Amino acid sequence: MPMKIENGPFWKRVRENLDNDFMRGAVAGMQDRGYVRRLGVIEELGHWEEWRSLAEQIRKHTLENLDFYLMQLSENVAKRGGHVFFAQTAEEANEYIRRVALEKQAKKIVKSKSMVTEEINLNPVLEAIGCQVVETDLGEYILQIDDHDPPSHIVGPALHKNKEQIRDVFQRKLGYTKSSDPVELARHAREMLRRDYLTADIGITGCNFAIAESGSITLVTNEGNADLVTALPKTQITVMGMERIVPTFEEMEVLVSMLTRSAVGQKLTSYITVLTGPRDEGDVDGPEEFHLVIVDNGRSSILGTEFQPVLQCIRCAACVNVCPVYRHIGGHSYGSIYSGPIGAVLSPLLGGYDDYKELPYASSLCAACTEACPVKIPLHELLIKHRQIIVEREGKAPVAEKLAMKAFRLGTASPSLYRFGTKLAPSAFAPFAEDGRITKGPGPLKAWTESREFPAPSKERFRDWFQTRQKGGNPS
C-alpha cells in the first residue's frame, strides 16, 4: 500500500535524523510548548479523565456499529444529492477520483489537509492526467513546492523546516524577494493561493468527522482554507477513512473539543467547517456536485481484532507530542506518513510488517502516549502485541536476537551449560570492563553502552558465594 515516504534501512534513517540538530531542536520545542498549552486548556476544562472516558465510549460504540452508521451516512448523503463511493483499496479510491476529474475536464484542483489522501498517494494519480494539484494548508503547501518533501508530523507537516529554509524555497519556486519573517512568508503564500481558489475546477478535502444522522462532513482548521476549498470550486470531493464517523452532532462536539485541546492546546480552532451535500437552489456558494469517497484500505481487517482500538484515533497527534523517541528521531525516520506511536501501531497494520517491522521497537514503552491519548487507545500495549506477532507469527525478529534467545534458552535449560557460562562470562567481558562497569560493550551491547553503562559479570558467582556462607566462611 502506498504509504511509504522514505526508502532505505530504518536505522540509516534514524542515524541521519539524529544528526539533524535543527529538527531535533524544533521537535523538542514543539513538544515542550505544546505540553504547557495542552495542560492549561485541560485544567480549564476540568474532569479530563471523565471527558476521555466519554470520548472513548463514543469511538468504541461507533466502531462496534460501524456498518450501521456508514449505511446511515451513505443514505443521508444521497438524500442531499451527493454521490457516495466505497473504496476497498487505495487503487479503487484513486481510480474513482481520477474518473471524476476526467469527466469534469479538470485542470486545477485545490486540496485542504488530508492524511488519507497522503495515505493513498492521490496527488501523483491526478498529476498523471494533467491536473495541477495545489495543497492549500500552509505546511503542506510548503512541502509540495519543495519538490514534494514528505510530512514529518500529523498536525504540523513542515515541522522539520525553519523559516530560512522556507524563505529559500519561496525564493526558488515562487519568486519571493522579501525576508524570512513568518508574517511576510504567510502573506505571500496567501496571495499565491487566492488565485488558485478562484480558478480551481475541483476541491478535495479530508474529513475530521462525518455525521451519520445528517450526511454532513466536518473539517477542523486554523487557516480557513477548507472553507474556500469547499465553497468555490463547482465540484467537491471528500475522502475519508471509513472509521472517521460519529452518530450525531452531539458526539462530534465532544470529539472536536478533545481534538483541539489535544492537538494544538486550544479550546477550539479558528474554523470548523460543516458541509452537507451540494448547494441547494438559492445558495450563493458551495459545490454544485458533491462526492464522498469512503476508504477501507485495510481498516476492515483491523475490525474485530486485538488492534481495533487503534481505529478510535482522531488524528490529534497527542501521542506524537509526548513521545521521547519521536523527540529524538523526528517523523521521517518512521518511513510512513503516520509517525510517532500511532504510526508505529498503524503503519504495520495498513502497510505490512515487511516495510514497518522496526516501528514497534521504536518505543521505550513508557506509556506516555497512552496517558496522553484523548480516546484512551492503549498504544504501548498494542506495540507489545506487534512485537509478539513479529517474533512468533511473522518470524521477522533480527538474526542476532534469534541467536541470542536460542543461546539463552539452551543455557538456562542445561545446568552444566549455565554453570560453564557463568564461569566464562567474567573473563569474556574483562577487556570491556572498568571498575565493575562495561562502558564500551561488544556486539549488541555497543549501542546500549553508547548512552548508558552495563554492569560487568561478577567474578564470584552467587552459588559459590552462598556455599561459602553456608560453610561459615567469610564471603567477599
From Swiss-Prot:
Per its UniProt record, what InterPro entries does this chain match? 4Fe4S_Fe-S-bd, 4Fe4S_Fe_S_CS, FTHF_cligase-like_sf, Helical_ferredxn, LUD_dom, LutB, LutB/LldF, LutB_C
The text of the family note is:
Belongs to the LutB/YkgF family.
Instruction: Say if the entry is tagged with keyword Repeat.
Output: yes
Annotated residues for binding of [4Fe-4S] cluster 2: C323, C366, C369
Which species is the source of this protein? Geobacillus kaustophilus (strain HTA426)
Q: Which UniProt keywords apply?
A: 4Fe-4S, Electron transport, Iron, Iron-sulfur, Metal-binding, Repeat, Transport
UniProt biased composition (Basic and acidic residues): 449-466
Q: Name one GO biological process term.
A: lactate metabolic process
Report which superkingdom the organism of origin falls in.
Bacteria
Q: What does this protein do?
A: Is involved in L-lactate degradation and allows cells to grow with lactate as the sole carbon source. Has probably a role as an electron transporter during oxidation of L-lactate.
Tell me which residues make up the 4Fe-4S ferredoxin-type domain. 304-334, 353-382
Q: Where is this region: Disordered?
A: 440-476
Pfam families in the cross-refs = Fer4_8, LUD_dom, LutB_C
Q: Where is the composition biased (Polar residues)?
A: 467-476
Residues bound to [4Fe-4S] cluster 1 are: C313, C316, C319, C373
- The entry's protein name is Lactate utilization protein B
GO MF annotation list: 4 iron, 4 sulfur cluster binding; metal ion binding
